[in-house]
């Protein structure tokens, strides 16, 4: 079973540094309260850690 992560943008990127805006965009998030699903891997975890104060993460077990 592969783990997946549901990532939701909970805070706005307005007024945030450019590198944080780019990271949020790279995760596939464009609008507030939008949720995307990604495979759990070190690259995605690193991006989440960089913008942890802007997103909410939920682990999903795939069957």
Swiss-Prot record:
InterPro entries registered for this protein in UniProt: Ribo_uL30_ferredoxin-like_sf, Ribosomal_uL30_bac-type, Ribosomal_uL30_CS, Ribosomal_uL30_ferredoxin-like
GO term, biological process aspect, one: translation
Top-level division of the source organism's lineage: Bacteria
PROSITE patterns, per the entry: RIBOSOMAL_L30 (PS00634)
CDD domains per record: Ribosomal_L30 (cd01658)
The entry's keywords: Ribonucleoprotein, Ribosomal protein
Pfam family, one: Ribosomal_L30
Keyword Ribonucleoprotein: yes
The keyword Magnesium is assigned to this record: no
Family: Belongs to the universal ribosomal protein uL30 family.
Protein name: Large ribosomal subunit protein uL30
């Amino acid at each position: 079973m592969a783990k997946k992560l549901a990532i939701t943008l909970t805070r706005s990127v307005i007024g945030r540094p450019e590198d944080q805006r780019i990271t949020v965009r790279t995760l596939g998030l464009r609008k507030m309260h939008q949720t995307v699903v990604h495979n759990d891997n070190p690259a995605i975890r690193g991006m989440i850690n960089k913008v942890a104060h802007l997103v909410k993460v939920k682990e999903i077990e795939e069957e």
